[in-house]
Amino acid sequence: MWAPRCRRFWSRWEQVAALLLLLLLLGVPPRSLALPPIRYSHAGICPNDMNPNLWVDAQSTCRRECETDQECETYEKCCPNVCGTKSCVAARYMDVKGKKGPVGMPKEATCDHFMCLQQGSECDIWDGQPVCKCKDRCEKEPSFTCASDGLTYYNRCYMDAEACSKGITLAVVTCRYHFTWPNTSPPPPETTMHPTTASPETPELDMAAPALLNNPVHQSVTMGETVSFLCDVVGRPRPEITWEKQLEDRENVVMRPNHVRGNVVVTNIAQLVIYNAQLQDAGIYTCTARNVAGVLRADFPLSVVRGHQAAATSESSPNGTAFPAAECLKPPDSEDCGEEQTRWHFDAQANNCLTFTFGHCHRNLNHFETYEACMLACMSGPLAACSLPALQGPCKAYAPRWAYNSQTGQCQSFVYGGCEGNGNNFESREACEESCPFPRGNQRCRACKPRQKLVTSFCRSDFVILGRVSELTEEPDSGRALVTVDEVLKDEKMGLKFLGQEPLEVTLLHVDWACPCPNVTVSEMPLIIMGEVDGGMAMLRPDSFVGASSARRVRKLREVMHKKTCDVLKEFLGLH
């Protein structure tokens, strides 16, 4: 009895084993022995844990906030973002010796059956892991598309990319307004009371110069905090955005999207973020937006104060007394008398407050902790309207307007949304040209700007002296200045060391005496003067460097001479 049963038992087992072997050879695991499905379960690490140059930028615009990984999708992690909080972002993986990433990472992952729900996103393999990312390339063929956010995009792909970058959903809508914008000169076409409609596929090239949606505002933060500026611009085609900080005596460093420099980051939507702000981070941060139709520059002031100074900086003058107006006209006190700090001073020529290096000599009162305190003390009138950027505003009652562009020196058309604009907003080109550029004093003059900054100008110049202008003679289209020389820093062609106590005669070329540049006036204030030599004569052109002398500037120039910086610049930049 036992033997037959045993044979039947082994016979059945052999059948089961054969079936299992057949299924395995065919690549179909039996249901009872199916492998457990791969689960990501928040495996991986945050981008900034893997590489300090990888940041959780504004792709989610800080809206997908979280506190733990469990609040995110299984393939995501809860990571610190640019806003100082945390948001869900696709996890990253890196190979470790002897390991191939965290447990649960598939060996050969593909995008098959991997869905990206965000509009404008697509699947990509990152270190063997499928992740969703925003499209970074769009076709160049125009197919203008009106979207539910009130904007017109170059084509559908650009609309989807914008939706992805902001983590929102955009839909195509019927175009209600259609303006054909000129570059500069001709006035905008008159519109009827009932605007015509146009198909998004209109082949007519529609261009509009960049315009801001929101007015730039000053921000003041305490040391160690995080601050961000968003240059929210519109234009057709979509403007390219760059950021730069206005630096004293140095070339500005231009930063583009996805650019990291120290504690300053420009995200993929061109949002400027400053982490762990320090006193030296204070200053004017300038956003430049440009497309084929025009260029726009907007200044975003940032003040950084110590914690115990935050309350004190709100008062512009003690006991409520008016700040002496004469102090606002004095040059910044850059002499070195102790600890150097970044402060603000009022620049009457620029009609704005700018940063400088304060050396605690206290020779005048034109130094402030914050931009706001400086403006409250010294800004006697409204900010020059013509120097403001074109501002569309958030509303959608679109109308054609004109604004003065200080970069091109011309009035240009832009789309006004109907609310929250600024003073640089005119109903016609004629009205714009009658009002701009903004008159300063009795003249319509712009600030003189040298062709290069301090160091580059020094290397390009034939002579550099420290001196005071004792006499100035005006002639048609030119002039002569007698300069009492205090010190010769550079002299390649004139032999100034043999001059003795005699003043140096400098010829001023191509001078418009209504708005003279360089701004040379008779004064006891010491100047740094850099110019050219032709036939043994010292000459200054309108773009020559002439600026107030300070211990810091002179120290910088001595350092340039000592380190032979000009030799390096001549070799790599071709200076002569």
UniProtKB/Swiss-Prot annotation:
Any single GO CC term annotated in Swiss-Prot or TrEMBL for this entry: extracellular space
Residues marked Reactive bond (site): 140-141
UniProt keyword list: Disulfide bond, Glycoprotein, Immunoglobulin domain, Metalloenzyme inhibitor, Metalloprotease inhibitor, Protease inhibitor, Repeat, Secreted, Serine protease inhibitor, Signal
WAP domain: residues covered: 39-92
CDD domains assigned: IgI_3_WFIKKN-like, KAZAL_FS, Kunitz_WFIKKN_1-like, Kunitz_WFIKKN_2-like, NTR_WFIKKN
NTR domain: residues covered: 445-566
Record-annotated BPTI/Kunitz inhibitor domain positions: 328-378, 386-436
One annotated GO biological process: negative regulation of transforming growth factor beta receptor signaling pathway
Matches recorded under Gene3D superfamilies: 2.40.50.120, 3.30.60.30, Elafin-like (4.10.75.10), Immunoglobulins (2.60.40.10), Pancreatic trypsin inhibitor Kunitz domain (4.10.410.10)
Disulfide bonds: 46-79, 62-83, 66-78, 72-88, 134-164, 138-157, 146-175, 231-287, 328-378, 337-361, 353-374, 386-436, 395-419, 411-432, 445-515, 448-517, 459-566
Signal peptide bounds: 1-34
Entries under Pfam families matching the protein: I-set (PF07679), Kunitz_BPTI (PF00014), NTR (PF01759), WAP (PF00095)
Domain Kazal-like: 126-177
Tissue specificity comment: Primarily expressed in ovary, testis and brain, but not in liver. In fetal tissues, it is primarily expressed in brain, skeletal muscle, thymus and kidney.
Subunit structure comment from the entry: Interacts with both mature and propeptide myostatin/MSTN.
Record protein name field: WAP, Kazal, immunoglobulin, Kunitz and NTR domain-containing protein 2
